[in-house]
Curated annotation (Swiss-Prot):
GO cellular component: actin cortical patch
Name of encoding gene: AIM21
Name of protein: Altered inheritance of mitochondria protein 21
Compositionally biased tracts (Polar residues): 11-28, 174-183, 189-227, 316-328, 570-594
Organism name: Candida albicans (strain WO-1)
Comp. bias regions, Basic residues: 656-667
Bias type Basic and acidic residues, positions: 72-81, 102-112, 123-149, 228-258, 267-289, 358-372, 535-544, 634-647
């Protein structure tokens, strides 16, 4: 059980206290923790369970007299505190509870001796009480160890308490016993704040004692807390309560100074301040005690930078001791400043922002008109110069804000001295709260003075040059305000006490962010504060601009490359041929006028060249209007000569290889390919025809005539009366074919073979060659054979002729002509079918 652990140190407490606890087991006290003990931070007892409530009543009986005193103090505090302040606090509770829990862990290390504060949250929520009770038990154990040193004899009596008071009980009695020990000495705990003051600096963590003194002295600080809840209420209440407002205003003004410290200090201070405010209200005003936030001062110490921001050195040095005991008033002022940073600071900044924005636009327009150059190089130089100026201006801003805060603090040193005399812990608390109040009052007066003459407050120009969001400026103001509250102001005061200097110092810091152009324009538009503040920056800017303008004046547009002479001439001819021709003529004539001899030759040649030859033309051969003037002719001739020269030069110039893609070579088959042109027609030579000359045989006519005469035998024709003139040839053929069965057949066949072996000879050479082909011996044989065997053939041939001669003599003449015509086919048939020798024999025999 967590409650069992604190029992052992509690047993070591004085026996007199334990006896009193035994006597007072169930008195009327349980009603008190509901109403008053919540306010009586020292005497209130936590009731984590129902058993605890019974034990608390037993513990509180011996404390009746000190409780009455505490009740009186609580009534006085309630009178001082305004009732409306209390309700807004619970509204804040949702956000602050989380922060309070964070601070409780930090506070436990510093709060060994005062268990009364953790008792407060018991009335609000038992769930929270259970969580807090564990932390409280740890605190009580630490507290009891110190008590044991003071009263070792009391340890024996607490052993009996173990029997009566079981695990949860010892936490409750331990706290009132420690207070009873103080009360036995001289009721020091009962006005818990007054008597326990010396113990605090030793233990460095009991905000309860510190809370009462600043509350009695700084009663107006308490109502300032609700002001932070709503920005509207803050603005109205600040006007009514000047003491509280300046703390917020001063802190707001101080917050603008340090940008690096802004986010870190704001988060930490907001948590710490919210916790401290709740502590003060719970202990003093609220009937609804919150979780124990005994010493929020530990939380106010500069924690490790949450967002990489670093507190200034004076903040870090002063925050160590001050953080342990920051009073309620200081926390309230810080909360007001933090919450009001958005409202009050923005109220001051926004009108200036509107003015500055307008002025910047006007200045930019003027500068743009004056400055035609818009080169990227100028922009780069400007950004570099801006960065350098921004760093310097940030330093100046920090120094100026510090000096302003110091000057304000120097004006009201009385409050600081009184607080310092009260004690080390109170000095730290008073510096935070009272100094903030004094600053707020002084700044209200100063701001009223500033608003009338200077239209632009020093804060206004800071943002507009970069046109950064208002939230950033407000955060800067809050940071500077927090820094100023924690600073030891005395050594800084003599540096720059006057408000005018502070304003002038603040104003130049503002233009540092914008570009150099904008800064100068702002200075020109707002001459009064800015001009004296930054002569160096302006001189540097002006010198830089002059150098940039001289060096960086816009270069003339790049000249186009000269076209080649041919291209230029061609373009001139296209666009303005008349001007081009006249210019060429003028140039040619002007350059060559002194050479009179050359010109004469050229004119003569040009005139003569107009005609077919170079002779003098006759009159009327040409139109005199067409004759060119001598100068023009000279120019044209010279231009022609130029063209000829150029053409000759180009012709003689080596032909350049056409540039193709490099590194790619054609394959050898393609590169070395040879194209051969072959005609489609094949030429063939040969003898188309030949001529042979031979003697004509005149005997043929005689043969035909004789053959017709010899063949006049009508016998065969009588049998073949059917054949007409047309059928003579057919009859002859049939007869010749019908009679192959002659006994001389073998010889005839032999002859036929011979004849067939040489048929072409008969065709080509003609029928006249039969005499040559057939030997005389064969002819004689055939004559004999005809007489013997071939009588029928002769008869047939003779019959053809005889039938014709039966007609008249005229018909005989015609028949002779017909036979002449029929002679050739008869011989042809003989050659093809029958041995031609037979016919030849007949022919030879007949003459």
């Amino acid at each position: 059980m967590p409650d069992s652990e604190p029992l052992e140190p509690l047993n070591q407490e004085s026996s007199s206290n334990t006896e009193q606890l035994k006597l007072s087991t169930t008195p009327n006290i349980p009603a008190r923790p509901q109403t008053r003990p919540q306010k009586q931070t020292t005497t209130t007892t936590t009731v984590p369970t129902d058993q605890d409530s019974t034990t608390e009543t037993s513990l509180e009986k011996p404390l009746d007299n000190p409780q009455d005193e505490l009740d009186e103090l609580a009534h006085e505090i309630e009178k001082v505190l305004s009732d409306p302040v209390i309700p807004p606090r619970p509204e804040h509770g949702s956000s602050t509870k989380s922060s309070e829990t964070q601070t409780e862990h930090k506070e436990q290390d510093f709060e060994p001796a005062h268990p009364a504060i953790p008792q407060r949250p018991t009335n609000k929520k038992e769930t929270i009480q259970s969580e807090v009770s564990d932390h409280k038990n740890g605190l009580e154990s630490k507290f009891d160890l110190k008590v044991n040193e003071e009263t070792p004899a009391d340890s024996v009596s607490t052993d009996k308490d173990k029997v009566h008071i079981k695990p949860s009980i010892p936490t409750i009695p331990s706290r009132p016993q420690s207070r009873n020990l103080d009360s036995s000495e001289v009721d020091n705990t009962k006005p818990s704040t007054t008597a326990s003051i010396p113990a605090r600096p030793q233990r460095q963590s009991t905000s309860t004692q510190d809370e009462y003194k600043p509350q009695a002295s700084n009663t107006p600080d308490i109502p300032t807390r609700p002001q932070t809840k709503t920005e509207k209420s803050v603005s109205s209440e600040e006007l009514d309560k000047p003491g509280d407002e300046p703390s917020s205003k001063d802190q707001d003004n101080e917050r603008y100074t340090d940008d690096s410290n802004a986010s870190k200090s704001i988060l930490e201070t907001e948590k710490a301040v919210a916790q401290e405010e709740k502590k003060a209200k719970k202990s003093d005003v609220d009937n609804k005690p919150s979780e124990p936030t005994t010493s929020t001062d530990s939380s106010t110490e500069p924690a490790a930078p949450a967002r990489g921001f670093r507190l200034p050195l004076h903040m870090q040095q002063g925050s160590g001791p001050i953080s342990t005991s920051t009073p309620v008033a200081g926390s309230e002022a810080e909360l007001n400043s933090l919450n009001n940073s958005n409202t009050f600071g923005d109220g001051e900044v926004t009108p200036g922002n509107s003015d500055t924005k307008a002025t910047f636009k006007n200045d930019e327009d003027v500068e743009n008109e004056n400055r035609t150059d818009s080169s990227s190089f100028d922009d780069d130089m400007e950004t570099i110069s801006q960065d350098n100026e921004d760093g310097e201006q940030d330093r100046r801003n920090r120094q100026e804000t510090a000096t302003e805060e110091n000057a304000q603090e120097s004006e009201a040193p009385q409050f600081e001295t009184t607080i310092i005399e009260s004690g080390e812990t109170e000095e730290r608390d008073g510096d935070d709260t009272d100094s903030g109040e004094l600053y707020s009052e002084q700044q209200q007066n100063k701001e009223k003075e500033k608003i009338v003459p200077a239209t632009s407050t020093p804060k206004i120009p800071q943002r507009p040059p970069k046109k950064s969001s208002l939230s950033r400026a407000t955060t800067n103001d809050s940071l500077t305000s927090l820094d100023s509250t924690s600073k030891p102001p005395k050594p800084v005061i003599p540096k720059r006490p006057t408000t005018e200097e502070s304003l002038s110092n603040i104003e130049p810091t503002i233009p540092s962010r914008p570009a150099t152009k904008k800064i100068t324009s702002v200075g020109e538009s707002q001459h009064e504060p800015i001009v004296p503040n930054r002569p160096d920056n302006k001189d540097l800017e002006s010198s830089q601009r002059d150098t940039q303008a001289s060096v960086k004046s816009k270069p003339p547009p790049p000249k186009p490359k000269k076209l080649s002479s041919k291209i230029a001439a061609f373009q001139q001819q296209l666009f303005n041929p008349a001007n081009a021709s006249s210019k060429e003529d003028v140039s040619s004539t002007g350059s060559k006028q002194p050479e009179s001899g050359i010109r004469k030759r050229s004119t003569e040649n040009s005139v003569l060249s107009r005609f077919g030859g170079k002779a003098i033309p006759l009159p009327g051969m040409f139109n005199p209007n067409q004759m060119p003037k001598p100068s023009i002719s000279h120019g044209e001739e010279t231009s022609d000569d130029r063209e000829e020269k150029q053409e000759s030069a180009t012709a003689n110039a080596p032909v350049r290889r056409t540039r193709g893609p490099r590194g790619k070579k054609l394959p050898k088959a393609v590169a070395d390919a040879e194209v051969k042109t072959e005609s489609r027609f094949a030429i063939e030579s040969g003898k188309l025809w030949s001529i042979e000359f031979k003697k004509k045989i005149v005997e043929e006519k005689e043969i035909t005539s004789t053959s017709v005469e010899d063949l006049e035998k009508p016998k065969i024709l009588s049998e073949n009366d059917e054949a007409g003139d047309e059928g003579k040839e057919t009859a002859v053929e049939n007869e010749v074919i019908d009679n192959p069965e002659i006994p001389v057949k073998d010889e005839l066949q032999h002859d036929v073979v011979d004849v067939v072996g040489h048929p072409e000879k008969d065709v080509v050479t003609g029928l006249d060659d039969d005499d040559e082909d057939v030997p005389p011996e064969v002819n004689e044989r055939f004559i004999k054979d005809e007489e013997i065997s071939n009588v029928g053939v002769e008869r047939t041939i003779a019959s053809e002729t005889t039938t014709e001669k039966h007609s008249t003599d005229e018909e005989e003449v015609e028949e002779e002509a017909v036979v002449d015509s029929v002679d050739i086919p008869i011989r042809r048939v003989a050659v093809n079918i029958v041995d031609s020798t037979e016919v030849q024999k007949d022919v030879e025999d007949e003459p």
